[in-house]
Design a protein with these regions (language model features):
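Domain-length accessory/inserted modules outside core catalytic folds
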Residues: 2-45, 52-140
Length: 140
């Protein structure tokens, strides 16, 4: 299972999750196993699902677009489960608080590069997903 989290209250992850799960059903049924393989969580929760404020998050000095495994290794966070968690920050900080444009704040290239690095040989669906994401209408 992959858990995608964003660090804003925006909903770009919802579109991402919709597209990725749709393609996972087609391209990697064994990995999908009948359940959603990717879940979007509020980025202001820690690994155990405990609420964390933006201020607390900044105090942990978590780098933008950091892989959760890297943060665990640096002891900046603790892992409550074995899910692969990818922490993604909005890459256009000046747009984060523009409500009507929040869905555009996730850089698809950053998402895909992290997924490729994290999934390794299992990333064959990512290339297929790129076109699917465009068709669903997410940011490119």
């Amino acid at each position: 299972m992959i858990t995608l989290t964003t660090l804003s209250t925006a909903h770009p992850a919802d579109v991402f999750v919709q597209a990725a799960n749709h393609l996972l059903r087609q391209q990697a049924p064994a990995m999908h196993n009948g359940q959603p393989a990717i879940h979007a969580l509020d980025g202001r929760t820690d690994a155990a699902g405990c609420f964390i404020t933006p201020e607390q998050f900044k105090q942990r000095h978590i780098p933008r677009n950091a892989l959760w495994s890297d943060l665990v290794r640096r002891k900046q966070v603790t892992s409550a489960h074995k899910d692969l968690i990818i922490k993604l920050n909005c890459v256009h900080d000046d747009m984060v608080y523009q409500e009507e444009r929040r869905w555009r704040t996730l850089d698809l290239r950053v998402v895909l590069s992290h997924l490729r690095a994290a999934l390794g040989p299992q990333c064959m669906w990512v290339q297929v997903y790129e076109e699917g994401f465009r068709r669903i209408g997410g940011p490119c």
